[in-house]
Amino acid sequence: MKLKFCGLNSIESLIHARELGADFAGLIFTDESPRKVGEAFLSKLPSFNFGETIPVCVFVNPSVLMVSNMIEMLPNSILQFHGEETDDFCRQFHHPFWKSIAVKDHDSYLLSANFPSAQAILFETHSINLHGGTGQSFDWRMLEGIDANNKFILAGGINQSNIKAAISMNPWC
C-alpha cells in the first residue's frame, strides 16, 4: 500500500514527509483551501529534492494554463483533480492524473467509470462547501462492491482510531 501526505505547504513539511517515506506529497493549488501553497514556497519547489516521494498537484476546476505551468515546474508530478473536470479535460495534458470522487451514497463509486484515463480514483467525504480537505472520513462500507483490481485511494479523516479499518478496505493508497 502507498502512503500520501496531503496539504503540505512548507519545505519543512516536505522534508518530514520524505524522511518518513511518504510515496506522495500533496500540494494544494486552490484558493478555497487554507493549506494552499504560497508564492515563496512555490519558488523553492523546482530545486527541492523530492527523493523517492512524488509530488501531487491538487486542483479544483483549474485553468489549462495553471495545470500546464505546474507540469512545467514539476514534470515528475501527478495531477489530482477535485472539481467538475471531465476525463477529456484531465487527459489533455498527457500527464498521469488521479480523479477525486466525493462519496455521498453507495452508488458514488460508480462515477469512477467516467474516468477511464485516470491512473487512480481518490474517494473522499462529500461536502457541500468544500472540494476535499475536510479531515472527515465517510462510511467506507459505501465502497463495497468496488473492483479491488482498480487503483483506488482512500482519503479524509484517516487517523489512529480507524487506520486498521482503512487498510482492510485494501486501497492502493
For each predicted feature, which ranges?
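Conserved N-terminal beta1-alpha1 strand-loop-helix module at the mouth
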Residues: 1-173
